């Protein structure tokens, strides 16, 4: 089931419709929404996909949320075996506010966030300050407890269906989340906490991702082929659209046979790439170390923002 962002060019969507029409296993979500960063659309899109599954009468064992930047890093046959061996487990992070590394915690839901963080940051900040000073904090919806976690999950269809039913009983509770901060890290997690017993929640997903020290997602390139193949996960993100070698390797892995080996721990974060993580920042900064296989974003905007000269030191050459 594919949700295609409503902001995408109509011509691109028309080509997707044509391709999907020839493949009966593919369904397109009719009710498309815009999926901007931190917007409710990132929650609404997967919910609309669940409704599409329900309306079609499909009965999957699991629903796995992936983006266009995700690719498999293990055989699909191995994934099927893993889900069979762990039937009934919900693969999602469900944590209290301590899960949030820094920044707003309970403020995420106590106050209303109407403005786009990336394009209306000043208005967002002024609105938050005004609400805080005027004492306009609100209560969390009755019967729910705020929970947080990564937006990348794999849930049983029974839980997805129960979630849709519970949301439909009292639509005002879901409406509350339209104005929370980063709802995709809160909504599904909160409902899973309310509907599923703790023993059935794995507290990890099946998708590997990493962030830089500046909070930006690491984009995996062609030099990460061996690293990605070694991951204890079933999917990896974000994969660069230009990483043709890595994309081909991932697709080859997906179509390969299941070797039947016992599964080790799946889900624990790996931080064995710390130098790469620290080096790959959104923009270059003084004292930053770069690596020969790293692509640095040196746009005109970045260069114009440099108030003082930069000195770049090269070497030593590896022997």
Residue ranges: model-predicted function:
Residues 1-319:
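ER/Golgi luminal nucleotide-sugar-dependent glycosyltransferases, focusing on the catalytic module
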